[in-house]
């Protein structure tokens, strides 16, 4: 019998029956430190990686599993969204100057218009953390509006679904932000992939994989982005026109 160095319980096995720690832990080495620090991060059973994998491969089924109670292997929707939204904001602040510089260089407007454009870009950069929260709310609303009768979903459940799926669109956007370092025009490409993903996810969730299902899903997605962009642009223009004349 070996006495556990952590809780003092005795065990004949490899792990302590009281606290679960190794009864005879190995001495620390550089290799062991690296293995311990990367195992949970890179292992497929890591909750974050597992949630991403499931949402990409089975977006409808995964979201439906969560709202029906099968949640053990998944990160909570808001926590998942908050993590990727924070990462998205950091990467946006870091890389947006490259894209804004490009758009300014090809813009042929007069100096006053160019000055206004630069101000709008600064406002977007400063407030992207707030704008990121608008699209999940609008998508949740339209998803609930379009699918509540067919699926029986309520708004809280729709919001959970939205946080999951919008998180995947943020991941797609982050990937293209990095790719834009090689070809700057790729910065604007994610919107296409995001619309396709959200439409497909909506179809899978509702079980409607026919043309009518695609049209319904696409309509909900387009309306979400349209309202989001309209509100965002209106707020920015109102600020520019009223405070920076």
Residue ranges and their predicted role:
Residues 1-245:
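Membrane-proximal intrinsically disordered regions of secretory-pathway and membrane-system proteins
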């Amino acid at each position: 019998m070996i006495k556990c160095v952590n809780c003092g319980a005795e065990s004949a096995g490899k792990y302590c029956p009281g606290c679960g720690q190794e009864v005879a832990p190995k001495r620390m080495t550089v290799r062991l430190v690296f293995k311990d620090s990367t195992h949970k991060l890179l292992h497929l059973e890591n909750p974050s990686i597992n949630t991403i994998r499931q949402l990409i491969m089975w977006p409808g089924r995964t979201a439906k599993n969560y709202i029906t109670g099968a949640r053990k292997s998944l990160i909570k929707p808001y926590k998942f969204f908050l993590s990727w939204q924070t990462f998205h904001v950091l990467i946006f602040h870091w890389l947006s100057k490259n894209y804004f510089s490009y758009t300014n260089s090809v813009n042929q407007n007069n100096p006053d218009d160019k000055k206004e454009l630069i101000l709008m870009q600064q406002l977007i950069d400063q407030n992207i953390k707030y704008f990121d929260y608008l699209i999940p709310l609008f998508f949740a609303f339209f998803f609930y509006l379009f699918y509540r009768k067919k699926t029986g979903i309520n708004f809280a459940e729709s919001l959970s679904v939205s946080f999951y799926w919008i998180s995947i669109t943020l991941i797609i956007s982050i990937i293209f932000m990095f790719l834009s370092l090689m070809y700057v025009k790729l910065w604007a490409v994610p919107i296409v992939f995001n619309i396709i993903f959200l439409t497909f996810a909506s179809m899978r969730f509702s079980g409607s994989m026919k043309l009518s299902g695609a049209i319904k899903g696409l309509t909900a997605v387009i309306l979400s982005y349209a309202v989001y962009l309209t509100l965002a642009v209106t707020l920015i223009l109102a600020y520019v026109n009223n405070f920076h004349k």
